[in-house]
Amino acid sequence: MSADRHVRQPAMPCAASACIGADVAGLALAPATEPSLFVAANVADGIASTIGDIRDFATVRDAIARHRPQVIIHLAAQPLVSKSFADPIETFATNALGTAHVLEAARLTPDVKAVVCITTDKVYRDQDWVWGYREQDPLGGKDPYSASKACAELVAASYRATLAERGNGVLISNARGGNIIGGGDWSADRIVPDFVRAVTGRLPISLRNPGAVRPWQHVMALVHGYLVLAARLVAGDRAAADNWNFGPSDDAARNVQDLVERLGASWTRPEIIYASGSFPETRFLHLESTKARSLLSWTPPLSFAETVDLTASWYRDFSANPADASQITLRQIEHYRDAVRTHGTR
């Protein structure tokens, strides 16, 4: 199913720094990194942007009431495992209570028809197995980040089951994505931004868990899935108001070392230093996404190699010409659309 018909609906992503689309209003914190894709690509020029914190309910309520969106894509989060250990209170307040703020404001705003809550592949209880996690597997979370996102899932489930019908009847879904890579991320303690900083600064890269297996996935594949899901909700498909895994094909579940080696082959290979991790991490993490493939007709068209090469290409081109961030991004969006048209699902 194409998301193109949906993109013209009035929409409001919470965490607008992460969104592409049309007719968009956004609520997000001020950019926290330098550089920032939101600034470099002049994202604010194309949307109605509100700088605010979802931990403040009045801010969320007022922004949603002012813009009256039909669709809310809730991306706002404290997304870093490392920071969740340093500041667990902020992590739980943002990820769990912030989700409640978004959903409470959504159900009290008559125009809102759909909310897609973006969580993570880390919401599942760690079974230390090689199989992909399915939507019905138990939630869990040993580290504060994973636990806070599992809490957000329960908040959304409560609103979906009972509170939405006591408001405007908004349809609510949870979308659980794989490990996201792609251009424009400069966060700390993430493998691709760390790789880019190592290459551009001519520094070594430190790998904490080179054997950890993750479902690497391009950000555009996830945006594609979120828009397809949102389109179903806006159309009134109550069956879509559920939990959904959006994971890559099996070949994309590779370890950290594989990712770094492919990035190096696509650009430049920095010196690698192996270091012990300062916090526990899951050894194997993979999503089973048959449900989205079968019922939403969604499958990402990019292989692991294509995903990594496209990511390296974005950063390489940006490093050569930072002023061209918007055009680099638009070219890659068109590349992804061409891949969908050419390959369809696979």
Task: List where the protein language model places each region.
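Residues in well-ordered alpha-helical elements
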Residues: 57-58, 70, 82, 89, ...
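C-terminal substrate-binding subdomain of Rossmann-fold SDR/epimerase-dehydratase oxidoreductases
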Residues: 9-26, 52, 179, 199-346
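N-terminal Rossmann-like NAD(P)+-binding domain of SDR-like oxidoreductases, especially those catalyzing
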Residues: 1-177, 181, 335-336
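Short aromatic-enriched loop/helix-cap "lid" or pocket-rim segments at secondary-structure transitions
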Residues: 36-39, 127-130, 185-188, 219-220, ...
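The catalytic Tyr-centered alpha-helix of NAD(P)H-dependent dehydrogenases
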Residues: 130, 141-148, 188, 192, ...
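Hydrophobic alpha-helix immediately C-terminal to the catalytic Tyr-X-X-X-Lys motif of short-chain
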Residues: 151, 155-159, 195, 259, ...
